[in-house]
Amino acid sequence: MTSASFAFSPRVLDPLDPQVRPDPQGRFGPFGGRFVPETLMSALTELEEAFEHHWRDPDFRAEFHNLLRDFVGRPSPLYFAQRLTEYYGGPQIYLKREDLNHTGAHKINNALGQVLLAVRMGKRRIIAETGAGQHGVATATVCARFGLECVIYMGALDMERQAPNVQRMRLLGAEVRGVESGTRTLKDALSEAIRDWVTNVETTHYVIGTVAGPHPYPKLVRAFHDVIGQETRQQCQEKWGGLPDVLLACVGGGSNALGLFNEFVRDPQVRLIGIEAAGEGLHTPRHAATLNRGRIGVLHGAMSYLLQDEEGQVQEAHSISAGLDYPGVGPEHSYLKEIGRAEYYAVTDDEAVEALLLLSRLEGIIPALETAHALAYLKTLAPQQGLRPANAIGPQQRVVVNCSGRGDKDLNTVFKYLQQRGRSF
């Protein structure tokens, strides 16, 4: 891993700029690229060529969208959160209900797309990494649907935090391999999955679960999640005949956020806001706020912002949310930050838990802890109690929050967290 600094010239985002898409080398400005061992270069080239070919194939697209409808249950609703809106006194808050997808999160969009691609490529063995377990469950689910061998790598600490999802993966026929090295979390699971892929590249497809990793993964994962934003645009037109004012999503690696944002990048009047995990606070080393506190370097095959020390070594990330507990971020998020098209802030563990409790009690929806980070930022955006920070928005503006997953998997974590602080549900 290396670190570097770059000089950026201010510019307006050009939707025709090939760097945005990304460019042929897989770069978003200086970010992205392909920093991998020579043994993986041919596999990545094969994957890129297969994706470009099949994504243009009407039969592939039709099969993908039919399965999104009939197997995943799309489109997911755009729900007006009336009581949450009343609580904050405005803005008008809508939830994009990815938690209602089959398996309970946005992750299945990408898992389905990649496994379909792997089948077309003749791969019969699928591997994946997972943090919160939702990507692992989604991948295991799709592998069961297509009768493929499935191996999931998961940090041992995350297996403890997300035991229900470990059970689901095994029930679906996947082999779950615990990773004891390093911090025993998502970063280490991803590293182990890459090692497996290097060894078994001829027979195996690696389903990366976020918009990180070497090219073409950031591009293809975004493509499979684009359905989130495409549906949102249509639903906004149907509900009020216009665009949302703000899109709000949590950011770990950043796939759910880009799935929502990408459709609206060319609409400058729509604010794009990503929320990272501040953990125990940005003033402490225990956070996962890569875009807020990181520096540029290379991790897991791509250049992006990373949490790293002065020697360029990757630092340990912390979040109560296993899905945000990652010291890197997708390279396109780094690019959107640098050109000023998207804003990135962070909320703490405490704030996320309070947001989870609030939505549960006001709307009858238990969100994932990942989603709760985005929901927590509504307190800053909303003019509640006369507080109007500089980036607050008006009471008639419309905010769409990506409800990226449901919170069943997090109940034990939240209950333990509250108990340690002398509280209960």
Curated annotation (Swiss-Prot):
It comes from the Bacteria. HAMAP family: Trp_synth_beta. The beta subunit is responsible for the synthesis of L-tryptophan from indole and L-serine. Belongs to the TrpB family. Keywords: Amino-acid biosynthesis, Aromatic amino acid biosynthesis, Lyase, Pyridoxal phosphate, Tryptophan biosynthesis. It catalyses: (1S,2R)-1-C-(indol-3-yl)glycerol 3-phosphate + L-serine = D-glyceraldehyde 3-phosphate + L-tryptophan + H2O. Tetramer of two alpha and two beta chains. This is Tryptophan synthase beta chain. PROSITE patterns: TRP_SYNTHASE_BETA. The modification N6-(pyridoxal phosphate)lysine is found at residue 107. GO terms for cellular component: cytoplasm. The keyword Phosphoprotein does not apply. GO terms for molecular function: tryptophan synthase activity. Pathway: Amino-acid biosynthesis; L-tryptophan biosynthesis; L-tryptophan from chorismate: step 5/5. Its cofactor is pyridoxal 5'-phosphate. Its EC number is 4.2.1.20.
